[in-house]
């Protein structure tokens, strides 16, 4: 698959997926400008130089915790569940595929031994503060 795909259900955006074969001719961010987590593809022609810089320290208020991971090796399934705990979608990711988990209940199932680059907002407050385990319908 190519391109960027959004996983939505009942008005909730669960995830954005960027498939490994996706290419752009210039830098492009896919997340809405107001999103607390920005992701995109950087693309420049040979010889491009970004001037030396640093990022301004600005206080930001973030109420949601989003996570992105990019599969380096292996195969991973991400399952999405509705507000009643019912599975409504499964996405299978291969090396080079990336996903941003935005809202809603999800589970990760490793199909083949995997390694992923994972990025999420900090600071880390401990699993007991960052995660809520949910009972789901397995029927």
What residue ranges belong to the model's regions?
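A short, compositionally biased micro-patch
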Residues: 45, 71, 94, 101-102, ...
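Double-stranded beta-helix
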Residues: 109-139
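Short beta-strand His + acidic residue motifs that chelate non-heme Fe in jelly-roll/DSBH
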Residues: 52, 78-79, 99-101, 105-111, ...
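A short, N-terminal "cap"/entry segment at the start of jelly-roll beta-barrel domains
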Residues: 1-43, 136
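Glycine- and acidic-residue-biased ligand/ion/polar-headgroup-sensing regions
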Residues: 45-46, 64-79
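Short acidic-glycine-tyrosine-enriched beta hairpin
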Residues: 82-103
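Conserved short histidine dyad/triad with adjacent acidic residue
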Residues: 23, 41-63
């Amino acid at each position: 698959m190519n391109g960027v795909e959004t996983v939505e259900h009942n008005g909730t955006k669960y995830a954005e997926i960027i498939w490994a074969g996706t290419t752009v001719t210039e830098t492009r961010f896919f997340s809405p400008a107001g999103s607390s987590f920005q992701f995109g593809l950087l693309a420049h022609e040979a010889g491009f130089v970004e001037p030396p810089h640093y990022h301004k320290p600005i206080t930001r208020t973030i109420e949601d915790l989003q996570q992105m991971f990019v599969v380096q090796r292996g195969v991973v399934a991400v399952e999405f569940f509705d507000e009643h705990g019912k599975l409504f979608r499964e996405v299978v990711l291969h090396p080079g595929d990336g996903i941003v988990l935005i809202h809603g209940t999800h589970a990760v199932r490793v199909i083949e031994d995997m390694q992923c680059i994972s990025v999420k907002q900090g600071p880390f407050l401990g699993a007991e503060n960052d995660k809520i385990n949910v009972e789901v319908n397995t029927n």
